[in-house]
Structures are given as structure tokens and as C-alpha cells.
Curated annotation (Swiss-Prot):
Binding site for ATP: 336-343
Role according to the record: Endonuclease that is involved in the suppression of homologous recombination and thus may have a key role in the control of bacterial genetic diversity.
Family: Belongs to the DNA mismatch repair MutS family. MutS2 subfamily.
Alphabetized NCBIfam families for the sequence: mutS2
Matches recorded under PANTHER family: OS10G0509000 PROTEIN, OS10G0509000 PROTEIN-RELATED
EC number: 3.1.-.-, 3.6.4.-
UniProt keyword Nucleotide-binding present: yes
Complex formation: Homodimer. Binds to stalled ribosomes, contacting rRNA.
Name of protein: Endonuclease MutS2
GO MF annotation list: ATP binding; ATP hydrolysis activity; ATP-dependent DNA damage sensor activity; endonuclease activity; mismatched DNA binding; ribosomal large subunit binding; rRNA binding
Keyword Methyltransferase: no
GO BP term, example: rescue of stalled ribosome
Amino acid sequence: MRQKSLNVLEFDKIKALIENETISDLGKEKVVDMAPATDFNTVEFQMNETDEISQIYNKHRMPSLSGLAKISTYIHRAKIGGVLSVSELNVIKRLIQIQNQYKTFYNNLLNEEETINYPILNDRMEQLPVLSDLYQSIHQKCDTYDLYDNASYELQGIRSKISSTNQRIKQNLDKIVKSQANQKKLSDAIVTVRNERNVIPVKAEYRQDFNGIVHDQSASGQTLYIEPSSIVEMSNQISRLKNDEAIERERILSALTVEVAEEADACLISESIMGQIDFLTAKARYASSIKGTKPQFTKDRTVYLPKAFHPLLDKQTVVANTIEFAQDIETVIITGPNTGGKTVTLKTLGLIIVMAQSGILIPTLDGSQLSIFENVYCDIGDEQSIEQSLSTFSSHMKNIVEILQDTTKNSLILFDELGAGTDPSEGAALAMSILDHVHEIGSLVMATTHYPELKAYSYNREGVMNASVEFDVNTLSPTYKLLMGVPGRSNAFDISKKLGLNMKVIQKAKSMIGQDEQEINEMIASLESNSKRVDEQRIELDYLLREAQDTHDALAKQYEQYQNHEKQLMNEAKEKANQRVKSATKEADDILKELRELRDQKGADVKEHELIDKKKQLDDQYEAKSLKQNVQKKKWDEINAGDEVKVLTYGQKGEVLELIDNNEAVVQMGIIKMKLPLEDLEKTKKTKSEPTKMIKRENRQSIKMELDLRGYRYDEAMVAVDQYLDQAVLSNYEQVYIIHGKGTGALQKGVQNHLKRHKSVASYRNGMPSEGGFGVTVVEIK
């Protein structure tokens, strides 16, 4: 899309606001590269992608992306045989940790809300690679700044020797500096370091009393820094051990780097996906700040923006307006007073289209509709912008020439004060001719003007609509409200009257302009009133229609769930019946086997065909029980309304409410009322009702990543924290959030003091602004 137009519309400021919401350089780079797309499928995909994350962001606390950083340079170095440092490996480890936490969060989300559907995010979560082995390798060997002592058996042995040797050196030196005989010979009773060797400060005149190596002297030469001979060999041993340590450290880091290289492609996939999520989350945060909504994109030429406002203006004072190109309308001409909001309307339309085609939720009410534009062209003087000064007629015309050369049918053109800066009669004629030319091309146009000739232009051309910005004659100021379909009218007489001009002067002036023009002004005033009323009614109707559609969707969903539940009950009943039949058949086979054994042992006169007949009788009986309706072969007592019965298909008890045609009965089973055949019912004796037992259902799903303590007393909160942290440890969480609110700060202080002493807590900190600030404590689990 034309960069000049993006600059005029100040799209760079929108990008800067979104960039401020990102966490990582990965997200920032994607914001910098963000530009409006022009392919329908791409635009729709980008918007759906942002909308999915926005829905989640507005309803849930999302996992922190803090610490997410670029790893591509590290991966490249690993692939070409370089060795990564501990800090670089920890950056890769943090990426894996973030992706795992996000995947856990998403899986918990699916468990909580079985009916949610986030297809794009779901695809991304499925693409996330499994990097558990690499994570564990780094986690077990790398501390924050160095390798753990137990990163390898050899490293542990070397560091143990270094530690014990240092201890011996310390004991030896302490003995020397604390010796009473040496107190007057030392400049100071301390041990210091020179050239990476432990030394003691000896007065120069006592040099001969100390055997050792002089490593340095003071500026005055009165103090010599001597390494006593008793520790020289031990210090040499330390040097050798440190060299061994460096070699072993390099070996471990090389091995870890090889593991990274083996997972290079997977790590880059993870980086790309989590960078995209950072980018989308930033767009979601920005959308939340402007209450952005998702537009519907259409392949027909459509622009409908209900209650749209400019996102860079003060949200407390900005006036929202409905901007629309009605059916078959290709040109909208806006008239009205200076500083009345005409230019802001143009920029609002252009900026919203650019935002939408960049996958950013737009500042309108729900229900907006947009087509996709190949380009947005602007000729806006920008006298209201700090960046530019008033353009001359020549510069305007040069810009218009470029626009007319490049524009297409699928373009949007925004003209501000078309034809201004020259003789009014020539300017008006030129403006109408330009609009005619653009109409022939087929571009959509919104233009502002002061020329009264252009008010009549729409009545002589098809596809052209007037609009105006409202002026309040009572306050003598613009209201910044846009009136679609209503041309601007002169307010000179009303303003003059309000300011106290003599009525005779006003009446004489009215007589000079002619009756027709007075009637036109009165007609326009009537149109303004009607337009405002219709606009309000339309918004109300749109709201009611959306509400009705939401209700319909909810009912359809509930009906589908009911049908699925009923089907599940039937399947469970059939399965239970089949299991009973299987058990009965096995029992029959066992009985026949015993009968045959008994016959063989006793020599009983039982023929094989008799046994087979008996088996057949059993088979007949069990087959009857396995039928869909579980038909009974026996004749049961007569069933009447009010009887308590057992429903054989479901194995549940119920009460007969009424009989239907002696073949069916209406039975109440708990909250379910069903019509069933009599042959599926077995009459039972009425039992005394027992007290209802409460069954506690254990929640086996993973716990949430946050604990909300708001409203808890101190003692209750501490118990809840202990229980929650135990569950978090069992769930393998590494980071959780404890919400205590700000209030007086007493609960926050109590929680953090408690965390200090908790065995499962590695560290804790106050939440960042994006995490809830001082109202949240972020806990790192050991």
C-alpha cells in the first residue's frame, strides 16, 4: 500500500503504540514489518488470528512472556560448531519454558471450556515442538551465571579439590597473619590478592623474616606483597585445577551446544511461534485499550463503520460517528464548518481501513463491514497536523495527478477540500470534473468541500451521497457529529440572531437570497433531524438483531449438547447390557462344562444333545436381554400411573406419570421425563426416601496458574497459599501468580513474608504492570 498515504494517516503512530506493548525483540520486529495486506484470504486470516488472542486476553490471565528473546544467532553458531555460553543456553532454556507454560495454559483452557474454538492458535500449539530433553539437559547443568558443580562427576571433583585447597591456603595464611610475633612485621593483618595469588602485606624492613615470592609492592616501596613459600605449591595446584576446570567446563558446554544444534530446526520453530504470539498479544493489548472489534470482510464493495472514532484522539472527548457507503454509493461529499471534524472523518476512515487490513481490531461498535482495498490514496492538506504545514494549490494538484494515474476500481480516495486554493468558480468546476473522472474509474471516494455547488452535485449524479458535520447554533460550536445523507447548510442567519443582530437586518438578508434557497435550508434542517433519528434507530435494531442471533446460537448449542448427552446415555446402556449378556454367556458355558465333567465322572445318563438344548435355552434367554429395548419374556404385574418402576434400558428408577394407549408410559427419571414402551419397565416396590448424600467430585484437571486471595482473611490466605503451592509443585509449574490486590498492602506483605519461608519457593517478585503490578506476586517454584 502507498507509503505516502500511510504517513498521512499516521499509521506509524499506531505501530509505535503496539510496539510498546511487546515483550521481546521478536515481537518488536514483527510490529516494524507490519503492513496492510491486500489479499482477501490473508487479511481475513490476520484478523481472525488477532481476534482469537484478543478473546483469550480479555477473559484469562495469559502466561508471562518475560525473558523471551531471539535465539537465531545462537542456533546459527551452534550449527557451525561454536560453543554457547551459560547465559546463551539459559536464553534457549527460557524460550522452551515459555512455550511449555503457554501450551499448558492452552490445554487447561480447552479443559475448562470444551466448546471454545481457536483453530489458528490450536494449529500453532500443535506445531510447537517437544523440547523436554533439551530443556532438562540445560536446566540440570546450567545455573543462572555458571555451570552447577554437579554438572559432571569430573567438574564436581575438580571444584571440590579447588575448594579444599583454598581452605588449606586460607588456614595457612590466617595462621601467619594472626601470629602475635608477626603483628609488627605486617603493614596490615589481612590477606589480599596480587596477580591472582594470595599474598600478605609485609613491611619492607622485615622482608628477610618471610620466605616467599614478592608479587608487588606499594607505591612508596614500604610494603611488599609476599606469597609465603608454604602456600606456593598449593597455589600452583589451584592454577592447575582451574585449568582443568576450564577444560571440563568447555567440554560440558560443547556437549550442550551439540544438543542445541541437533534441535536447531525445532528451536527456530519455537522462536517463530512464540515471537508471533508476543506480536499478537501486543495487538490484543492495544485493541483492548481502544475497545477494538472485529469487522466482517466482504467481497462486495462495502463500508459500514458504526460509531467509529479516531484511535489517536483523546478517548474521553472524541466523538464517534457512523461512516457508511450505502448500497450503490461510490462517492460521499462532506460539507460543513471549518474545524467541524471533516478532515478527522477522512483520516478516521482511511486509518481504520489500514488497521483492519493489517490485522488490528478497529475502534467501532460490533457489526462493522469492510471490503478489501488495493490502495488508499490521500490528498489531505493536514493543516490540523503538527508534522505538515498548509499545502498550496500546486502541491495539491500534483498529488491529485499522481492519484488519478494510479487509482483502480478497488481503491479508496480521500480528498480534503477538493479544488480549494484557487478561484471558487474554477475550483468548484475542477472538483466536479475530478469526481466525474474518478467515478468512471470506479474508485470509492470521500471528499470534503466548502463549495455550495458540490451540494447539488449529488442530486445530478448516480452513486453520490451528501454528508455534513453538525453545528450547534445554541453554543455556536461544531458538535463533530457526522450526518450521512444530509448536505451542510448555512448557519449564518441563526448565528447572527444568537449573537443579537437586529431582526430587521436578518429578515432583509433572507429576502435577498430568495425563497427557494430559504426552503432548501429548511429542508436540510429537517433532514438533519430525521437522519439523527434514523441513525439511532438503526444502531438499536442492529443491537437487537445481534442479541437475537446470540440467543439463537446459544439455544442451538444447548439442543446439540442435549442430543449428544441422550445419545451417550443410550450407548452406555447398550454397553452395560452387552456386558451383562457376555457375563451370562460365560457363566452358562462354565455350568455346561461342569455338567459334562460330572456326567463323565458319575456316568450319568445325560445325552450331549440334551446339554446342547439346555445351552440353547440359556442363549435364547440372554439374547432377549441384549435387545435394544431389553424386552422381557416374563409377564409383569400391570403397571399404572403413580407406580415406581425400573427402566431396564438405563438401569434407573422412575415414576410413571401417565399411560399412553396401553403400550407406552411417560416416566419421570430425576429431572428427565421420557416416553418409554411398557415392556421396558419393571414394577418395583416403593421405597422410603433417604436423605440425599452429597457426592464430592474430585477435580482431576490441572490447577490454574493463579491463586486469587482477594477477600480472604490472613489465616485463610496462608492456608490457601500452602495448599496451592503444593498443587503447583505436583503440576510441575515453574512460575505461578498470587493475586492479593493492592488495598492497604497488609495481605501482600503477609503473603511475601510467608513465601520467604516456604520450602517450595525459589524466589518471588512484584508483578510487572502487564501482569497486575503490585496487586500480584509472581512466584518461581523450585
